[in-house]
């Protein structure tokens, strides 16, 4: 559940939706949501007769928890590898299931830039998988929209 809320501050969820998503009972999800809310990690808001939960970005531990989640997923290693060896990268973003906070086993990364070495990307996929234990898909020069999480933006 931490992945859901801390991979991106924009992610949110409600009790029944989370129970379905995680294939767990509503009672176990409720207990976990209450524990995280009482500790201050999650905020609650009411919308259309539903209680919506999202990460408390003002919590002193938010940045640390987000960094831990991203390290757990192997995102930092992917970003560093891409920036160092792939070419002239302008932006790197997370998309797909992981951007929604769902640990599906396949990380989808958008890489936008000039002269990006696609052959090298294909070559390093097995190495990344071995290192982080997840499949990685690279999408070159795709649109970054509201469903993506920007991991890196080139500064001039």
Where are the model-predicted features located?
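Catalytic core of pol beta-like nucleotidyltransferases
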Residues: 2-88, 98-104, 114-156
